Amino acid sequence: MADQRMDISSTISDFMSPGPTDLLSGSLGTSGVDCNRKRKGSATDYQLDDFAFEESMDTDKDDPHGRLEYAEHQGRIKNAREAHSQIEKRRRDKMNSFIDELASLVPTCNAMSRKLDKLTVLRMAVQHMKTLRGATNPYTEANYKPTFLSDDELKHLILRAADGFLFVVGCDRGKILFVSESVFKILNYSQNDLIGQSLFDYLHPKDIAKVKEQLSSSDTAPRERLIDAKTGLPVKTDITPGPSRLCSGARRSFFCRMKCNRPSVKVEDKDFASTCSKKKDRKSFCTIHSTGYLKSWPPTKMGLDEDNEPDNEGCNLSCLVAIGRLHSHMVPQPANGEIRVKSMEYVSRHAIDGKFVFVDQRATAILAYLPQELLGTSCYEYFHQDDIGHLAECHRQVLQTREKITTNCYKFKIKDGSFITLRSRWFSFMNPWTKEVEYIVSTNTVVLANVLEGGDPTFPQLTAPPHSMDSMLPSGEGGPKRTHPTVPGIPGGTRAGAGKIGRMIAEEIMEIHRIRGSSPSSCGSSPLNITSTPPPDASSPGGKKILNGGTPDIPSTGLLPGQAQETPGYPYSDSSSILGENPHIGIDMIDNDQGSSSPSNDEAAMAVIMSLLEADAGLGGPVDFSDLPWPL
């Protein structure tokens, strides 16, 4: 019994001993301190195998073995922090090295006198990548020069091979910085006459905008001022000379007209001094094909002392280095033998009145005209007068039908005044929404002499023979035959004022469209594809006025004599129709510009229009709506 009491008391004393309580409270206190320390900003919680070293170290502080482990734990934390800082330092160093390497690859960063910040380097790198535009394998100019040739020898070889002249033009002001001596053979100007002058003074006025466009957008050296992101001040540059790099975005090739210095005409008669002075001062132009690159040099390297302004400090001098060659148009030569070569052709687009609205660049090699010389002019101004009648008929057909029209061979005047033989395929483009013809597309092919003699099966000839201009212009009864006026300075062969023909044909077709525009049957078809309609009844008011008043003044349909019943697409196909009494073409209005109509003719024309409205639209009586597909 006594032994049992002693065991119970010992058990109670062991249970009531403070050791476990202190251990529990110490553990809770340690964990609380550890949590507070983590909340205050401890960067990292280092744990191994999900066991907190701090808890174990705080628990066994009094134990020597525990103190040793605590010291080792603190050392590990310190080493981990140092390793983390070393990793961050290595990362920053690597990023800085990449930024420096990127700055060395960008040409604009190399020109800076001071070290740029990272944001400026990245912005310049993005700007440089945009200028490359996907160019691959950029090359340096030094790689293209053989080692055994000097610069002067290479220049002479290039000029001899190109058969032109070398010139350097500043992109900012168009100043001629250098030109080779061979320019005298082409432009008849000496080297000293051109160096230092503005290129724009020797260009045709219509080509100045085109050349300025070619000189602008310098891809090699942007002209804008660079701002430092830290200080906000402009960055000053110290340009270091190096091999300039060429890219596809800096390549230039264009045509322009330049003045040719002709020998002055000596005028001895004082009475004609005012008229001859204009001819003496007038300089002829020749077409120059310029091919080269946009490059940049330091202003000090070019030896220019005038660009010492503060704005120009730190900017490269952008220049156009090009070879200018005289561009002579290609005159087709008769082919010898039966060698088949690809025919020369160009594409042009015309308004409905025949004016050029687009010309392919290939036309320059065939016609010697630049595209801007032809734009806005009528094609009838270049047609030979013997072919105008046939081409006018083709013009009507292409406006009234959707089919392709192939013309016969005709003569087209080129720039030197001679004529070249062409054959064209015309088709009209009709707007699907407005149902109106917007423009005419013409594919013009040069016809060689042997093809013209033997005939070409690929180009079928039209059945209607070409009509000359004289056969289309009515002459007075018993009067003399019309003579074609000649214009001083313009070679013969074309007709003065022929550009009005296309406008008259367009107005004629539009007038027919207006007459037929209110007919319900024409709503689903093309407005220019007009179907035949019987003539108005003589019992109608319009018909009585027509019978009493004669033929109304309505634009002619353009039918040639004897073709009234063969050509479809006109309002009246019967020879006794209203328009059949005036079948000839109205080109004689070119010489008569009065064009005024009398009141009686206006009333007769209005009567015809009203009669057509009554006959086609049913305005003269009640209308039956039972045939409509929708309920009313």
Curated annotation (Swiss-Prot):
Coiled-coil intervals: none
PTM text: Ubiquitinated, leading to its proteasomal degradation. Deubiquitinated by USP9X.
Sites of the Glycyl lysine isopeptide (Lys-Gly) (interchain with G-Cter in SUMO) crosslink: 266
Effect of residue 544 to R: Decreased acetylation, leading to decreased transcription elongation during the activation phase of the circadian cycle
Cross-link annotation Glycyl lysine isopeptide (Lys-Gly) (interchain with G-Cter in SUMO2 and SUMO3), location: 259
Subcellular location: Nucleus; Cytoplasm; Nucleus, PML body
Domain bHLH: 79-132
Region (Disordered): 1-39, 465-498, 517-601
Annotated site location: Important for interaction with CLOCK: 132
Domain PAC: residue ranges: 408-451
MF terms (GO), sorted A to Z: bHLH transcription factor binding; DNA binding; DNA-binding transcription activator activity, RNA polymerase II-specific; DNA-binding transcription factor activity; DNA-binding transcription factor activity, RNA polymerase II-specific; E-box binding; protein heterodimerization activity; RNA polymerase II cis-regulatory region sequence-specific DNA binding
Role: Transcriptional activator which forms a core component of the circadian clock. The circadian clock, an internal time-keeping system, regulates various physiological processes through the generation of approximately 24 hour circadian rhythms in gene expression, which are translated into rhythms in metabolism and behavior. It is derived from the Latin roots 'circa' (about) and 'diem' (day) and acts as an important regulator of a wide array of physiological functions including metabolism, sleep, body temperature, blood pressure, endocrine, immune, cardiovascular, and renal function.
Subunit structure: Component of the circadian clock oscillator which includes the CRY1/2 proteins, CLOCK or NPAS2, BMAL1 or BMAL2, CSNK1D and/or CSNK1E, TIMELESS and the PER1/2/3 proteins. Forms a heterodimer with CLOCK. The CLOCK-BMAL1 heterodimer is required for E-box-dependent transactivation, for CLOCK nuclear translocation and degradation, and, for phosphorylation of both CLOCK and BMAL1. Part of a nuclear complex which also includes RACK1 and PRKCA; RACK1 and PRKCA are recruited to the complex in a circadian manner. Interacts with NPAS2. Interacts with EZH2. Interacts with SUMO3. Interacts with SIRT1.
PANTHER family: CIRCADIAN PROTEIN CLOCK/ARNT/BMAL/PAS
This protein's name: Basic helix-loop-helix ARNT-like protein 1
